[in-house]
Amino acid sequence: MSSNVVETIQPVAAAIVSAHQFELVDLEFVREGQSWYLRLYIDKPGGINIEECAMVSDELSEKLDAMEPDPIPQAYFLEVSSPGAERPLKKEADFQNAIGKYVHVGLYQKLDGKKIFEGDLTAVTPTTLTIDYLDKTRHKTVTINREQISQARLAVKF
């Protein structure tokens, strides 16, 4: 059900977001406990502010309320926010823009004995990512096939 909701709402949300020259980073419809959440993550160069999130929320809420049939028949919470410092990497442009940045990549199965790699993204191809990471005190490089990646995001280095 949640994928149908996302497929139905995505073009509506994308039109509103792009009309303001923002980027729709991600859209999800998820159940947490007893409640459903429709979450949009939006951004722009220099970052998004709370007023811009509220504006998109108001416009999307109005559009969704006017849609027939109702794309979300059950009660839900609409949340519009910035993707934050640990922005997810999903689209090709996200990966390209992350070259040279510190990333967190989770895998479906272990590679070289690890399921999680954190390091500097050094190269991106249509099928692979290359990360320079620190293994204890040694610098290592790993090339990961994209189909092995369960999730990828920017990370904050401490």
UniProtKB/Swiss-Prot annotation:
Q: What are the record's GO terms for cellular component?
A: cytosol
Biological process according to GO: ribosomal small subunit assembly; translation
Output the Pfam families linked to this UniProt entry: DUF150_C (PF17384), RimP_N (PF02576)
Intrachain disulfide bonds: none
Which keywords does this Swiss-Prot/TrEMBL entry list? Answer: Cytoplasm, Ribosome biogenesis
Where is it chiefly localized? cytoplasm
What protein family does this chain belong to? Belongs to the RimP family.
Q: What does this protein do?
A: Required for maturation of 30S ribosomal subunits.
Q: What is this protein called?
A: Ribosome maturation factor RimP
